[in-house]
């Protein structure tokens, strides 16, 4: 059994070397296909991740007027510290909504710190009294469909300056995620089929060039599995070689994209899939798909042209 495997392995490697240019063409087609598959997969998985993050973090930002101290129990008035009669009026109005999951206060100082982390030191000119930001309440909804209702009700609360719900952008992202999932997977499947077809043509030429040898093997009683073995291994090798370059690109490029794009997402409580998780899984998937494509292409040729 082991000796047969190594015999098939030797025949497959010898055939790849003998049909050098066709091997290069087949490997190149697999490489291009898997690169495109990796791109589509990266977009699909990360779009789905962002959509999930939004669904799990559906929120409305309610900005409080600058003349309202809703989160302080006392205020300074005419040089004296007095009780704040407006304490938590906005907070209580938001908290009492049946569609609200939680309400969290975010001071303008906290927002300023987050903004400088994202935008850089250019915003430091607004530090202290020059801070143009507003105190705000971060309101999490029970469900995505509740966002618009919460936003409309929050606008009616006295002391509220502005309300941001990101409704239109959120809906567009959900629609985009759905579109990419359906069409992205469809295009990836089409690319895999095309690569398998190209490999099948490469294997077919090999089969034709060795047709006399194959006929003799069949006449002397060689089993179908014995004849089929070297060709399946040859296809698998083509797929394996074609997966190397896309895997290297995934490892390098995804790391660069993650470091540059994820910074702008963190401030919105969103994130891409971590390279430590995504890259190993994607690389393993590319090698599996590569071997599958190669074996499938070889199998198609054997079935169509040898009638085995």
From Swiss-Prot:
Extracellular side: 1-24, 200-236, 298-308
Compartment(s): Cell membrane
Gene: ftsX
Entry GO CC: plasma membrane
Residue runs in coiled coils: none
Membrane topology term: Multi-pass membrane protein
GO biological process: cell division
Predominant location: membrane
Protein name: Cell division protein FtsX
Taxonomic superkingdom: Bacteria
Annotated family: Belongs to the ABC-4 integral membrane protein family. FtsX subfamily.
Taxonomic classification: Bacteria, Bacillati, Bacillota, Bacilli, Lactobacillales
Record topological domains on the Cytoplasmic side: 46-178, 258-276
UniProt function note: Part of the ABC transporter FtsEX involved in asymmetric cellular division facilitating the initiation of sporulation. Required in maintaining normal growth and cellular morphology.
Subunit structure: Interacts with FtsE. Interacts (via large extracellular loop) with PcsB (via N-terminal coiled coil domain). This interaction directs PcsB to equatorial and septal sites of dividing cells.
Keywords per UniProt: Cell cycle, Cell division, Cell membrane, Membrane, Transmembrane, Transmembrane helix
């Amino acid at each position: 059994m082991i000796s047969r495997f190594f015999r098939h392995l030797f025949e497959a490697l010898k055939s790849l070397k003998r049909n050098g240019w066709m091997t290069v063409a087949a490997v190149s087609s697999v490489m291009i296909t898997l690169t495109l598959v990796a791109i589509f997969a990266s977009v699909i998985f990360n779009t789905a991740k962002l959509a999930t993050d939004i669904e799990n973090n559906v929120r409305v930002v309610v900005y409080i007027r600058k003349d309202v101290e809703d989160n302080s129990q006392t205020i300074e008035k005419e040089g004296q510290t007095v009780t704040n009669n407006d304490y938590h009026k906005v907070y209580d109005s938001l908290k009492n909504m049946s569609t609200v999951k939680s309400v969290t206060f975010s001071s303008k100082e906290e927002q300023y710190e987050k903004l400088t982390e994202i935008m850089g030191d250019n915003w430091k000119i607004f530090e202290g009294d020059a801070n143009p930001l507003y105190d705000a309440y971060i309101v999490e909804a029970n469900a995505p469909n509740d966002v618009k209702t919460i936003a409309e009700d929050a606008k009616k609360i006295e002391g509220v300056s502005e309300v941001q719900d990101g409704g239109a952008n959120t809906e567009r992202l959900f629609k985009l995620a759905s579109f990419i999932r359906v069409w992205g997977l469809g295009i990836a499947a089409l690319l895999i089929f095309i690569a398998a077809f190209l490999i099948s043509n490469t294997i077919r030429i090999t089969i034709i060039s060795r047709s006399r040898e194959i006929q003799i093997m069949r006449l002397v009683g060689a089993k179908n599995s014995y004849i089929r073995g070297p060709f399946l291994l040859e296809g698998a090798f083509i797929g394996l070689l074609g997966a190397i370059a896309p895997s290297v690109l995934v490892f390098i490029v995804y790391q660069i994209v993650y470091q540059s794009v994820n910074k702008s997402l963190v401030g919105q409580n969103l994130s891409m899939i971590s390279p430590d998780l995504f890259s190993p899984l994607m690389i393993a998937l590319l090698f599996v798909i590569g071997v599958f494509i190669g074996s499938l292409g070889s199998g198609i040729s054997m079935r169509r042209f040898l009638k085995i």
